[in-house]
């Protein structure tokens, strides 16, 4: 699937609906302004325009399967952020000594909490929040040291697993730093996981201790604790919950403060602790798989340090003046890596949540301030779904403007798009037109980092223009510790994920079945392989899957086979153009196994054949269906629809009726809500080997089916 499509400025311009005479006058003013500012900015603009076309990565040899490296690491890959700091505890010690009394972790105080009754009768919790309260580097270090000591007192052993199942907050990072210091292997689980997945992760890793929050203990863990027989200690980061009678014997609940108090006592007794080695496991990060059972990725200290080294080198002027807003799940490699990059460079990290991020967020009481308005971050990571939501909300506001205001916005938008393509800035547009949009994220954002799924060219360009900052689109996997590529801040091209980071190299492997070869012209194509110190140790207790996805070359370098298909542009930047596997990550981050969806539905009497399709730019699954002629004709008769076979298949009413049947079957088959096709296309023609849509063995040819139904895909997903 073509996840990344390069778009020129002309194809993304907004349409104007303004009186032609007034339009000519405004264009005259803009032209006059451009001429007057052209000469002073000429040399600066020219250099900026040339910069995006510079070579950013190149192959290390002339062979077709040669790896590409950043031009800054052709002679050797980077693996250490600071000399001598080869484990995460040493990195934090270095940062603590350098930025000792500087603010590090910030949390907003809850001033008031209210229940607000909605028109439909539902009750929403609304909060009024105060200012950020900050912990310094020294504060965090002492709390982590005491907490680690306290965990030792509870029986936690070095190189033994300990789980964290908690929302993104300062206590999460403090607990993680404690584990890194004391060489406890931190098992991370998403706070959104369902009961069976949580039980699987806890039992597979044989944890005896788990760190969580009061809310998650009451809403998620309470019902499954009895299914985790080795569990002995539960540590809540925000106070002790009420006891319940069904709580299993032998399991003790502690508060984080109480465990830290134990640690203070241990400090007085000078109890020594084990130090990690670079090769030791730092994190076992659970990630979704095609079967729905999460897999634990083993990530060493050296993996994480190499990854954050590569990421940090792609962020210019990173330092003490920067403020990062943390709200994505810390159990996700993108957020954990981003926060560790900030922590190691003296940046402040202020915590938030998707429900309190902006003034208009769902939990913020009307009239009070969201987190971005108070924190005013300079750096922010986001997944495409959040950026798409911002794009849609702003454009809805634009459409509600008066005709004059709307057209002024559109003129400024299109003008800035043209200037960006030339490498020029637009200070007047930024100041007078886009200032209010920029304030949605606090007004100080200088870099947005996007990862987790592909970002559409339209949304990327919108964020560039309206928030007056670059969008660094990255590509990486949990298995590569999140590191792979990130676009340069001065590269405003869309549809690409940038050049390899200095910590890794990337090569393309032929995929004959898909028709992708590293000898393809005009650009090499193939399966993306990532090599470097950031490539992880493999899957926990899953040697077979590890051997499938990882290998070591003759030089001892570890490589990851991603299953994604890429293409290198002449300047060394990577595009993601297809996916080898039928596992697709939706825009919100859920993984959908297309084969699983098809298997659940293809045996229905109404269905002769089905192909599920999902695109990472969107949040739902669609499908192409060859209906059984007899069953569909009968369904049409019972619903009162008439017409020829082709007319029935092309009828939107019949599509909806078939969709109802599919949805019921999907629920019966226990498919998740996000796995159920939301829209379908009925095909009047069967898929045979002669059509080229299936193999001789009648296996689906996904690439050909996508091409065949491209117009229907665009219809079902709609255009931006």
Curated annotation (Swiss-Prot):
Q: Which organism is it from?
A: Mus musculus
Q: Which GO terms describe its cellular component?
A: endoplasmic reticulum membrane; Golgi apparatus; lipid droplet; mitochondrial outer membrane; perinuclear region of cytoplasm; peroxisomal membrane
Q: Which coenzyme or cofactor does it need?
A: Mg(2+)
Keyword Transferase recorded:
no
- Mitochondrion as UniProt keyword: yes
Gene3D superfamilies (UniProt xref): N-terminal domain of ligase-like
PROSITE patterns linked: AMP_BINDING (PS00455)
Q: Phosphoserine: which positions carry it?
A: 683
A GO biological process this protein is involved in? long-chain fatty acid import into cell
Report TM segments: 21-41
GN (gene name) = Acsl3
The topology of this chain with respect to the membrane is: Single-pass type III membrane protein
Which sequence ranges are listed under topological domain Cytoplasmic? 42-720
Q: Which family does it belong to?
A: Belongs to the ATP-dependent AMP-binding enzyme family.
| Protein name per UniProt | Fatty acid CoA ligase Acsl3
Where is this chain's protein located in or outside the cell?
Mitochondrion outer membrane; Peroxisome membrane; Microsome membrane; Endoplasmic reticulum membrane
Tell what triggers its expression.
High expression in ob/ob mice (obese) and mice fed at high sucrose diet.
Matches recorded under SUPFAM superfamilies: Acetyl-CoA synthetase-like
Q: What reaction does this enzyme carry out catalytically?
A: a long-chain fatty acid + ATP + CoA = a long-chain fatty acyl-CoA + AMP + diphosphate; (E)-hexadec-2-enoate + ATP + CoA = (2E)-hexadecenoyl-CoA + AMP + diphosphate; (5Z,8Z,11Z,14Z)-eicosatetraenoate + ATP + CoA = (5Z,8Z,11Z,14Z)-eicosatetraenoyl-CoA + AMP + diphosphate; 15-hydroxy-(5Z,8Z,11Z,13E)-eicosatetraenoate + ATP + CoA = 15-hydroxy-(5Z,8Z,11Z,13E)-eicosatetraenoyl-CoA + AMP + diphosphate
Per UniProt, what is one Pfam family of this protein? AMP-binding
Cited InterPro entries: AMP-binding_CS, AMP-dep_synth/lig_dom, ANL_N_sf
